[in-house]
């Protein structure tokens, strides 16, 4: 159910809930009448946000960048990705951002407790080559900054990328046959 590996692949986890809540919030907004009229453009923006984040991560990991340079690049790529997602569907992005913080703040707290208590779970596991820099710098680097700044971008981008096509399909199903032909 849980893993002691770094970034452990566990059945219990917050990441796998993102597509579910992306669909949930998108459908709720759709039924409330707050959805894009057309879905091609929002889908392109959402896909562009994901492509940017993936490309940025690839560059950061393959270039052997210093932590400060990676952090700076990651902030910039994250900000641009969030803007693209917000352009895709602003209210869905806001809902997913709020959900992202509501789900990630408790994770950061649990990770703090795990690191302090040495629980030997994925919450306190470090890469073998991670430098011995003390508790607070380690906590900020591996928990606080990722959970509070970067995982929300994942939540907004992936949640939107999953929610937008589902609502596009619902919109097509909702149309009457005469509207669909027009």
Q: Model-derived features: where do they sit?
A:
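Alpha-helical transmembrane segments and their immediate interhelical/interface regions
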Residues: 1-15, 49-92
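Membrane-interface helix-boundary motifs at transmembrane edges
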Residues: 2, 29-40, 87-95
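Hydrophobic cores of alpha-helical transmembrane segments in multi-pass inner/ER membrane proteins
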Residues: 13-26, 76-85, 153-166
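A glycine-rich, hydrophobic loop/mini-helix early in the fold
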Residues: 29-62
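Cytoplasmic juxtamembrane regions at transmembrane-helix boundaries
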Residues: 33-44, 165-182
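Central hydrophobic cores of alpha-helical transmembrane segments
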Residues: 95-106
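Juxtamembrane non-transmembrane "cap" segments at the membrane-aqueous interface
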Residues: 106-134
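Hydrophobic alpha-helical transmembrane segments
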Residues: 135-161
């Amino acid at each position: 159910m849980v893993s002691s590996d770094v970034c452990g692949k566990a059945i219990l986890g917050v990441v796998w809930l993102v597509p579910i809540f992306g669909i949930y919030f998108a459908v709720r907004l759709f039924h409330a009448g707050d959805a894009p009229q057309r879905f091609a453009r929002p889908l392109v923006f959402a896909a562009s946000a994901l492509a940017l984040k993936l490309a940025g991560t690839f560059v950061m990991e393959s270039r052997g960048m210093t932590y400060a340079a990676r952090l700076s690049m990651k902030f910039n790529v994250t900000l641009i990705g969030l803007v693209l997602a917000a352009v895709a569907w602003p209210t869905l992005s806001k809902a997913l951002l709020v959900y992202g913080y509501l789900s990630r703040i408790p994770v950061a707290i649990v990770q703090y407790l795990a690191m302090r208590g040495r629980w030997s779970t994925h919450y306190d596991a470090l890469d073998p080559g991670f430098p011995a820099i003390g508790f607070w710098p380690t906590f900020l680097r591996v928990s606080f900054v990722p959970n509070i700044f970067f995982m929300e971008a994942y939540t907004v981008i992936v949640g939107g990328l999953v929610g937008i096509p589902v609502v596009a399909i619902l919109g097509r199903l909702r149309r009457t046959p005469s509207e669909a032909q027009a």
